[in-house]
Curated annotation (Swiss-Prot):
Keyword Nucleotide-binding: no
Family, as annotated: Belongs to the monovalent cation:proton antiporter 1 (CPA1) transporter (TC 2.A.36) family. NhaP2 subfamily.
GO BP terms: cell volume homeostasis; intracellular potassium ion homeostasis
Domain RCK C-terminal residues, every copy: 405-486
Role: K(+)/H(+) antiporter that extrudes potassium in exchange for external protons and maintains the internal concentration of potassium under toxic levels.
Full protein name: K(+)/H(+) antiporter NhaP2
Lineage: Bacteria, Pseudomonadati, Pseudomonadota, Gammaproteobacteria, Alteromonadales
Swiss-Prot/TrEMBL catalytic activity: K(+)(in) + H(+)(out) = K(+)(out) + H(+)(in)
GO molecular function: flavin adenine dinucleotide binding; potassium:proton antiporter activity
Cellular localisation: Cell inner membrane
Amino acid sequence: MDADSINSFFLIGALLTAVSVLLSPMSSRLGIPILLIFLAVGILAGEDGPGGILFDDYSTAYLVSNFALAIILLDGGMRTRVASFRVALWPALSLATFGVAITTSITGVMAAWLFDLHWLQGLLVGAIVGSTDAAAVFSLLKGRSLNERVGATLEIESGSNDPMAVFLTVTLIAILANVGAELSASFMLISFIKQFGLGVLLGLGGGWLLWKLVNVSKLAEGLYSILVLSGGLMIYATSNKLGGSGILSIYLVGLFLGNKPTRGRHAILNVLDGMTWVSQIGMFLVLGLLLTPSDLLDIWLPGLALAFGMILFARPLAVWLSLLPFKSFGSRDRWFISWVGLRGAVPIILAVFPMMAGLPGAQLYFNLAFFVVIVSLLVQGASLTTAARLAKVELPPKPLPISRSGVEIYPKSEWEVFVYCLSESKWCIGEPLKRLAMPDGTRIAAVFRNNTLLHPSGSTCLEAGDILCVLGQEKSLEALSNLFSQAPETDEVSRFFGDFFIDTEVKLADLAPIYGLTLDDETGAMTVADLVALELGAHPVLGDQFLWQSLHWVVAGLYEGKVTNVGIRLPADA
């Protein structure tokens, strides 16, 4: 490659990236996933588009996609709270193993019938598209206030279901590439255990070593993110090299670092946020360039049948069977989890495996994977907001600061500055600072009014439009945000939680005359907390609800895993 070619490469790459960024606001206006915008830019720049760029280097696409996916999973792991594993780990693992196997089997049968394939080839197609995609799930769920059990289950499933898909794909390729040869059950079992076992072992062990290394190193602030990124990629590559799941490993590395007091944590997250955007853009641009849309015309009708068969039949059946042991999931939860079986980069990456192995029909597998991904993003991704509303799994948005940043006062510092803009509706307008009931361990560090820094004292009265900079820790974020930030509309809160909020220590007998409850001696002695435990089990989450005596009872407050109050919706409001 000469200097002119290199400059052309930089120019085209920068131009496509800039166009992707500038077109990204269209996703919210059109109601489509932003990943589809990036993919469309790549397709338009490709062989069949006005750009006319000829790109068919599957090895480069595989390299770029794996690198990008590793960064996305590292960032996603660092933003996942380990507390969510309390309610979502086992359901997510069931979906990541049994769910993938069931989806693969059903989709494989449909593929074999629709495309007149050998049943093993059909299963290979099912394995390729059988897992949900972490990049798509993290991207589309980011910023949404979903029921914790549902949201955490989807995120953990997407971060942990790739080992099963990779195991099935690699095993089926080995069988098809050596027709007549038998793969022993012990070999397959060992391969499966290596994928999961090494993935978990290297992820948690490597995460611990990397955490220790980061905290003992004295580096320039900008170097911590590079250390985490390079360390995560080393663990990812090592896991893959030894036969484990690098995808699972790097997700667990991020999870470990994100839930431990880590030096430079906020700076690391800021850098990873930008790197994740670059990775998503780069990955879907390259995959878009790789696709030749005209190749999809020959398979569009059976391809649609396969995609919708997976969306409407295979995925829902897999979800319902996988979640049978978990009674805490209601029918609405299961329906929404079924719908958010998003496919993205991972099926396309897996579809490259048969091409690199030189299998007959590999191009068909690749085109099918691409077709399924496009349909999934268009149908499931674009309707995600509507699906969440219909399933009633999206909570009213939590009040949050307009920005937050870390204060690296000392290693492992957990102090942050939260910035709030006061609206006219806040009760604290006109009140002196000394009358504010601030959470323990927090302090107003600065007040700005009309672009001017004030010198506040206890008698300083707050005005609408004031900007407050508050020093505190994440544990105080909810209380601070309730005090200062813009709260969701009252109608939105009452529509979800109901108009009446009841403390869980109240006895049902005291509520009976108010709400017309019919109680026997046993239920009359129960508190609301007893009723919630009876109906929802040991680990309820915010937004959980149940119907009892014609009233809808909704968990409206939690503290350290314990329900503190519930909302009551009357039948007419349900």
